[in-house]
Amino acid sequence: MTITSPVIKTPPLNSEIRLESNLTVESGDIEINEKDIVNASEVIVILDAGSQYSKVIDRRVRELNVASEIHPLNIDLLELIKIKSKSGSTIKGIIISGGPESVYGENAPKFDKSLFSEKLNLPIFGICYGMQLMNYIFGGKVESNSQREDGVHNIEILKDENQQLVSKLFKNLNQTEQVLLTHGDSVTKIADGFKIICKSDDGIVSGIENERLGYYGVQFHPEVDLTTNGKKMFSNFLIDICGCSANYTLDDREQQAITYIKSIVSNKKVLVLVSGGVDSTVCAALISKAIGPENVIALHIDNGFMRKDESLNVEKALSVLGLHLIVVDASQTFYNSTTTIKGHLTSSLKETISPEERRKIIGDTFMRVAENEVKKLGLQPEDVYLAQGTLRPDLIESSSKTVSGVADVIKTHHNDTELVRILRDSGRVVEPLKDYHKDEVRELGKSLGLSDSLVWRQPFPGPGLAIRIICADEPYLVNYDFTNNVVQYLVTGEASSELESEVKIKIDKQLTEMKCKRQDKITIKPVLLPIQTVGVQGDGRTYSYLLGLYSSENSTIDQIPWSYIFNLARTIPKICHNINRVVFIFSQNATKHTNIKVSNEPVKHITPTRLTPDVIKQLQHADSIVSEQLYKYNLIKSLSQVPVVSLPIDFGVTGNRSIAIRTFITNDFMTGVPAIPGKNISFDCLQEITNNILTSVNGISKVLFDCTSKPPGTTEFL
């Protein structure tokens, strides 16, 4: 295993412009779907190269009052222009998204040959992969980096001879800007006619332009919240470069959703799966408004993995909508359920370790239970539509073709399994929120008259606690010793003699480039935990190690050097790619509770864990403690989501487990940051949470605090 990627050179340059390359198609081979066409006088076309963030680009454009459409990269653009012109619509510009492939790779997505031709003659904004493609096609060079750039970085915008920022794209921005970078390839030779407009803090080309052609490219992601002024960059491209009039308003989105519901459902019944969370509640309220509450059947399925007293709270919350609510206790059905994946029958859910299989079993079982309830009501399944509060991030992370045909699967969401896709393809699934992100759903909920207590409930995944319990029969130890040596040296400067000097030199060089210095007096130490969590890096899925950090001085919570901890949490996954999540392990003094000390020895033991009743009750208890404190300290609105996770790490006490807490802050759940103790969450709140868990939940060795941004860690651990 290596911690860096080899340099892979692109094929030899045969011509100035590679429009005859194997990446092009004569005309797009994807049929244009009328449902993807927006009725607006001006439109920006977003070409999806497989990015997890394509719909976020779409959202940013809409926020600036410009209509947008997402199409596959290989759509027939000239045919699309014809279709748009017939309806009186003009395409004003094109945005090419990022993606997980390399422009020189065998699996690089194809694009329509007219994209960069004079026939099209439209401004183009290439993001990440889009910039690399633009540079490569015009004769530049793209190579694999010696190390990835993943996470928040600063870029330096270049100035011209008059000391003005060199590009229209960056008008009214600062010379130094914070951005999100997630890439393993970089532009190493600029194509003729293009110029560099910004560089990263690592000195890597982060932006190029050809002003004459109206082509602009950035290596970072301006669409996500972690890029501080990304929205301004989009505004500069849309208004100043493309000349959009910005007269497309979003006021009618609720009415559009109602029209969509009526057009699909007509006079039939709709079965709404309601968990009690904001997504399903808003979905139920919207459908009720569209077709009347008498035509809506609200079904709450208790799958056995709910929060403490969840089903009772759901009944109270949904009674205000005046819906016909059915509550079904299907816990035993779920525990014993199986499904078929690629022709293979899975084990029962209670025996399943794989998080992906668990999600698929749960999703398919939801559908089967729902169909059974329809039959009990005397309704024919073909006369009933299924409604779900599916959001855009769910479809993106599941790589649904509704959003993208080429995005990597990060995780399967319970509301986007293969069975749901079959129902969707047959036209029997209604998903009025599929173009919405979480904060937009909350705004819609307010406009529908829902109370704050409903709109601001902490999000809870449909599969429930089943995906907040990390199951394992044995420790994960693939390349454990090497990885442990790497992080020991990275954090402390000390490592076993087995770690080669060449690796140490690389680590020191990377730490210097990232401006991350080790402590003068080493008090923070790492411990590699032998389990895996799900992450997203470079538009792709990772299933990698969890790393713990702890204080050797047993500092209290307010004495912990949090800024240094978060710096390590950003740095470690960038250098050691088989770690995607970093947690801080609270010590004895930090929790004011006599508990188990973290050993300096490698952790190579776990408590075998499955979805058994005792494990579920243990997590329910811990989760309820966290929820109580969130309400007590008025953190329900400021913390977007707080997953509480059971880990099979015993820290030397046979049979024990540990609890991890992820205090996550985000607008759209596509990217986000952890809450900072003492700033976003008080020391007292953390103190009470950890003390209460350790004193009142039996069998818990440690409480861990997640310090990881998204990316590289996903919102949930699994």
From Swiss-Prot:
Q: What domain of life does the native source organism fall in?
A: Eukaryota
GO molecular function terms noted in the UniProt entry? ATP binding; GMP synthase (glutamine-hydrolyzing) activity; GMP synthase activity
PROSITE patterns, sorted:
GATASE_TYPE_1, GMPS_ATP_PPASE
Q: Which organism is it from?
A: Dictyostelium discoideum (Social amoeba)
- Amino acids binding ATP: S275, G276, G277, V278, D279, S280, T281
The biological pathway it contributes to is: Purine metabolism; GMP biosynthesis; GMP from XMP (L-Gln route): step 1/1
Where does the GMPS ATP-PPase domain start and stop, copy by copy? 248-457
> Alphabetically, which GO biological process terms does the record hold?
GMP biosynthetic process; GMP metabolic process
Keyword check for Nucleotide-binding: yes
User: What UniProt keywords are attached to this protein's entry?
Assistant: ATP-binding, Glutamine amidotransferase, GMP biosynthesis, Ligase, Nucleotide-binding, Purine biosynthesis
Per the UniProt record, which EC number(s) apply here?
Answer: 6.3.5.2
According to its UniProt record, which reaction does this protein catalyse?
Answer: XMP + L-glutamine + ATP + H2O = GMP + L-glutamate + AMP + diphosphate + 2 H(+)
Q: How does it assemble?
A: Homodimer.
Task: List GO terms (cellular component aspect).
Answer: cytosol; phagocytic vesicle
Which Pfam families does the record match to this protein?
GATase, GMP_synt_C, NAD_synthase
Per its record, how is this protein called by name? GMP synthase [glutamine-hydrolyzing]
Q: What is the lineage of its organism?
A: Eukaryota, Amoebozoa, Evosea, Eumycetozoa, Dictyostelia
Query: Which stretches make up the Glutamine amidotransferase type-1 domain?
Result: 43-247
List, alphabetically, the InterPro entries matched: Class_I_gatase-like, GATASE, GMP_synth_C, GMP_synth_GATase, GMPS_ATP_PPase_dom, NAD/GMP_synthase, Rossmann-like_a/b/a_fold
Q: Which residues form the active site?
A: C128 (for gatase activity), H221 (for gatase activity), E223 (for gatase activity)
